[in-house]
């Protein structure tokens, strides 16, 4: 996996917001010095020209919170191979984000027990403080008929996780375009939603569905190429 600072997921510099500050990385403009401003932000050349202390003003940058949502619902996959590929995709995205020092949440479907009277609407957040722990937890997940589908997982993740900037929805070939659209609508405006359909029998590809980026991959190696292509088209 390439660094999450490139392509679609790039955010080391951040996306500037309209909020102004005196201590961030996106330079915006100069203004007159005010009591309490740090001297290190004084712009000496402009100060000399105007005869008044001038300081740099910046735009705040939006730090990236990546969410990787993996469905464990049997109905979202046509084969065990699809599910295994989906788990590998979730692991690759999560590990890359952890190694890049990003804020990342990896969530999977909750499975409703047989004795429960109603469906449990929740997701399980996996450990993301170190790559090895995340991979250990992914190694024991499995599909289940009683697991929440990708639409429910997306909706709950959107409610539970604050400050999401990029959401990856990882599923199999049985997830329909309508279900993916509904899942993407769970996230607030401004969140980049990317659905990754894992299908070893399919030709890798990219398409846009109502503002949603949909990547189809047949092998894990396709993921890097697919993400790079998405960034080029977006």
Annotate each PLM feature.
Residues 10-33:
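Intrinsically disordered, low-complexity linkers and stems that provide flexible hinges
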Residues 12, 32-234:
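Exposed, interaction-prone extracellular/peripheral surfaces
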Residues 1-7:
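Membrane-proximal, non-transmembrane interaction regions of membrane/secretory-pathway proteins
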């Amino acid at each position: 996996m390439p660094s999450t600072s490139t392509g679609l997921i790039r955010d080391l510099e951040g996306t500037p917001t309209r909020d102004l500050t005196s201590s961030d990385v996106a330079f915006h403009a100069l203004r007159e010095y005010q009591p309490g401003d740090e001297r290190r932000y004084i712009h000496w050349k402009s100060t000399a020209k105007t005869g008044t202390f001038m300081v740099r003003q910046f735009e705040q940058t939006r730090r990236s919170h990546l969410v990787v949502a993996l469905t464990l619902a049997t109905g979202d996959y046509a084969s065990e191979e699809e599910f295994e590929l989906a788990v590998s995709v979730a692991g690759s995205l999560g590990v890359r984000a952890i190694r890049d020092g990003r804020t990342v949440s990896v969530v999977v479907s909750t499975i409703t027990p047989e004795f429960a009277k109603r469906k449990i609407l929740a997701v399980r957040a996996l450990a993301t403080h170190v790559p090895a722990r995340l991979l250990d937890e992914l190694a024991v997940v499995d599909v289940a008929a009683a697991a929440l589908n990708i639409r429910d997982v997306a909706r709950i993740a959107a409610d539970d996780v604050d400050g999401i900037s990029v959401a990856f929805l990882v599923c199999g070939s049985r997830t329909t375009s309508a279900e993916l659209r509904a899942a993407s609508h769970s996230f607030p405006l401004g969140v980049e939603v990317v659905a990754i359909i894992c299908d070893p029998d399919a030709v890798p590809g990219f398409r846009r569905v109502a503002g949603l980026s949909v990547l189809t991959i047949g092998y894990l190696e396709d993921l890097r190429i697919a993400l790079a292509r998405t960034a080029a088209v977006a």
